[in-house]
Amino acid sequence: MRLCLWLLFLVVVTARPLRAQGDRCADCHIANPQADPVPEHTYDWEASAHGRNVVGCEKCHDGDATTFESFLAHRGILTSRNPASPTHRTNLPQTCGKCHIGPFVEFQKSRHYQLLRESRGEGPTCSTCHGAVAARLLSPRSLEKRCDTCHGPDGVHPNSDFAPDGRILLQEVNAVRELLATAPRLIGRVKDPVRKKALEDAYEQAQVPLREAVHSAHAFVFDQMRERLKAAKERSEALLIELANP
């Protein structure tokens, strides 16, 4: 009987989902906050899109997420102050770009990226706008204030239009996202398979210029972003009109 229970335990453990197995870094840091110099770092990760989608600590920090042995888990990890660390400010775009390919490609075209490379980490990087681990999306007003840090009247590169333009464009991105957010539920109610497929295709086609607009935002080429947002809005509105007229 004991042997059967032990075998059952092994089956359950080895069959644990990847989410449970991939959280060992966070499990240990959350369980031992007194040993963590910045426990809020782990809490922010857990509540973030990264945490919800099981993008574990090792994806950015390296290390071994398969063990609870502290020495082995932290082997190879470098402090973010080390220029060789994947979380050093200069290296963050490449680290984030392993998953966020589109934004990384566009960011490399920007003056921000040039400044980051030229200044050896003193220029703006991913965490400047998105935070360290929370991967947050700033509100339009928060984005305007962040842009004003450098581009306001007292900033290192004053530009009276840059910050308000960024706020307005992010508001437009959010507006298009809200339009599209209603579509999947309505499409799901369509009974005719042919019409449903056509609507699903139209939904995907509306998403394309929206993604392109968000990507181009990372190059800070606002004219291109406006053009892509215009296309996304037109396609989204056409889709919703079609859904309203069965």
Tell me what each language-model feature is.
Residues 6-17:
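Hydrophobic h-region of N-terminal signal peptides that target proteins for export
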Residues 17-246:
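Short sequence/structural segments immediately N-terminal
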Residues 1-4:
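Positively charged n-region of N-terminal signal peptides that target proteins for export
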